[in-house]
Regions:
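Transmembrane-helix motifs of polytopic, lipid-linked glycan transferases
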Residues: 107-129
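Multi-pass, polyprenyl lipid-linked donor-dependent membrane glycosyltransferases
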Residues: 55, 82, 105-112, 138-168, ...
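Membrane-embedded, lumen/periplasm-facing catalytic core of multi-pass transferases
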Residues: 124, 173, 359-430, 450
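Specific aromatic-rich, kink-prone transmembrane helix
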Residues: 117-122, 142, 161-180, 184, ...
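Perimembrane helix-loop-helix junctions
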Residues: 13-15, 174, 197-229, 296-300, ...
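Membrane-lumen/periplasm interface segments of specific transmembrane helices
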Residues: 42, 220-290, 318, 322, ...
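Hydrophobic/aromatic-rich transmembrane helices and adjacent perimembrane loops
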Residues: 153, 159, 191, 197-198, ...
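Signature aromatic-anchored transmembrane alpha helix within multi-pass, membrane-resident enzymes
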Residues: 16, 26, 30-35, 183, ...
Length: 545
């Protein structure tokens, strides 16, 4: 019972009032999520049937297919490694409910990305409490138009769910809901193993912050964050039992544990991480605003931001020290914190400079989706990955008009060999090569392949890879050797270039052996295909009928 102005209200009234409040909050949250999901799905509309790209085709889709078809949580179709099965289970569930298709995969990932953006929005609200304006909406907009988020939101990779559950765990921790934060961390480490950084940071923070004061309660709160450690430990035990290796396979362990710890490689990787976070894609504008706002906004130095900054720094250091591949997508869990900081810092600027800075930052982020940087970068950092997939699809279709096996490298091999990846209706025989280095090509001279598809996996418009400094550093620390060009390979193996695809500075080539017997076999198959489709001529540029 409650007495209000001389009247007594029954407990049932209070329960109804509380329930009504929670219903309004839930309705608003659902509305925000629905709006974000609708925008993301509509924005990605032309890409919803896009074939699988790179690690999707080589690792995560095969692993998810194992769960879907046979219930195997440790993959047989792909090389097993330390990555937990959380994302793959989500895809298997989506396929079970809506059918095994690329469209189902893309929409399932966009719905997951919408949840991640929504949790990032809630985190931005928490981080900007007490500030004027609506910086949380600015942070959400910056995140959604950023090239890395936009590209990754449709791809079946681990780092998007890692971002969402990192943001959720941090939000719950900042609200002192430690048990719920620990449960979110369990889901996080089952999405990606590097998520273990978050519960370790939270547990240590509690013990350090409350040292000497109520140690019993502090230890109980910190102990919750042993749950995700135990969950990840059980997964590693399962890997050890079924594969004989703690991380699934020894090559993965060597490449991701010992290889990055060389001081030179670590320093270079760290500089690259810092450049991407604070300079690239127009981030230098937000960084400048943050430096200006540091003295003006005490909010940026309070406990909330200290926890967030500690987590962001710990994650960036962890993926730098424990990851052989220099992929920017590993930094996705840092972006909600980064864009919240940029949005809050922009509020400290005078109105006119704030409008100019925000406009320029938005323009840079949107432009970075379509404009490639002048140095080598992973295609998955922006929409360049779509151009690469288009070239793969055209090259696969052109090669499939011939009967011979195609010699090429990953990921082109997966485009040809597995129809589930969306490139061909039927598998085409492949001869997988590790690379296009001179030694690899020289080994083919005794038995040249009938067909080859040659391409580069990175753009280099400023010819950075041709400089002496680049060749020395990457040759010494990354075992880099310049791959042979399509022209060089064609001369070495007595082949001719029959097709070439150019897109945004990227080139892919189809080479055909000039041996008369081999050519006769290939042309007979090609003529049969032309007859099937009623004649036609392959375009020299597109490779389509």
């Amino acid at each position: 019972m409650e007495r209000v102005r001389g009247r007594v209200r029954p407990r049932s009234y209070l329960l109804r009032n509380t329930r009504s409040t929670w219903q309004r909050v839930a309705a608003r949250a659902l509305l925000v999520y629905a709006v974000v999901a609708a925008i993301l799905i509509l924005a990605h509309g032309p890409l919803l049937r896009l074939p699988y790209y790179w690690d999707e085709a080589g690792q995560f889709i095969p692993a998810a297919t194992d769960i879907y078809q046979t219930g195997a949580w440790i993959s047989h179709a792909a090389t097993p490694n330390v990555h937990p099965p959380g994302l793959m289970a989500w895809l298997a569930l989506a396929w079970r409910m809506f059918g095994f298709s690329i469209l189902t995969t893309r929409i399932a990932m966009l719905l997951l990305a919408s949840f991640c953006a929504f949790t990032a929005f809630l985190l931005a609200i928490e981080l900007s409490r007490g500030s004027p304006g609506t910086p949380a909406f600015t942070a959400l907009a910056l995140l959604c138009i950023s090239p890395l988020f936009f590209a990754q939101s449709i791809m079946a990779l681990l780092d998007m769910p890692a971002m969402g559950f990192t943001a959720l765990a941090l939000l719950l921790f900042l609200r002192n809901r430690f048990r719920e934060a620990a449960i979110a961390c369990v889901v996080l480490v089952m999405a990606k193993e590097t998520g273990i950084v978050a519960p370790l940071v939270f547990g240590v923070w509690i013990l350090f912050e409350r040292r000497g004061v109520g140690t019993g309660g502090s230890r109980r709160d910190a102990a919750w964050f042993l749950l995700p450690v135990a969950a990840l430990g059980l997964w590693l035990l399962a890997l050890r039992h079924f594969t004989g290796h703690w991380l699934g396979n020894p090559a993965f362990a060597s490449y991701n544990l010992s290889f990055p710890l060389n001081p030179a490689r670590f320093a270079f990787a760290l500089l690259r991480r810092l450049y991407y976070l604070f300079i690239g894609s127009g981030h230098f504008i937000g960084t400048g605003a943050f430096v200006y706002a540091w003295k003006c906004l005490p909010l940026l130095r309070d406990r909330t931001w200290r926890v967030a900054a500690t987590l962001a720094a710990a994650h960036a250091l962890a993926v730098t020290a424990l990851g052989g591949a220099l992929l920017e997508r590993y930094l996705l869990p840092v972006l909600p914190i980064l864009y919240a900081a940029f949005a809050l810092a922009l509020r400290a600027l005078p109105e006119r400079p704030r409008q100019v800075a925000l406009t320029c930052l938005v323009a840079c982020l949107i432009g970075a989706n379509f404009i490639n940087p002048p140095y080598p970068f992973p295609f998955e950092n922006n929409l360049m990955f779509v151009s690469f997939i288009d070239a793969e699809r055209d090259a696969a279709a052109a090669a499939d008009t011939y009967s011979g096996a195609v010699a090429t490298t990953f990921p082109m091999t997966t485009a040809l060999a597995n129809p589930d990846n969306g490139y061909l209706a039927h598998p085409h025989a492949v001869r997988e090569l590790p690379d296009f280095r001179p030694a690899t090509i020289a080994a083919l001279t005794s038995d040249p392949p009938p067909l080859m598809i040659v391409y580069s996996t990175e753009l280099d418009p400023w010819h950075v890879r041709s400089t002496r400094a680049f060749r020395w550093f990457f040759g010494r620390y990354y075992d880099y050797e310049r791959p042979m060009t399509a022209d060089e390979i064609s001369k070495t193996l007595n082949m001719r270039i029959t097709r070439r695809w150019d897109n945004h500075g990227f080139s892919m080539y189809l080479l055909v052996r000039t041996d008369p017997v081999k050519m006769g076999m290939c042309l007979t198959h090609q003529t049969a295909i032309y007859s099937k489709f009623g004649g036609g001529r392959l375009s020299e540029k597109s490779g389509r009928v």
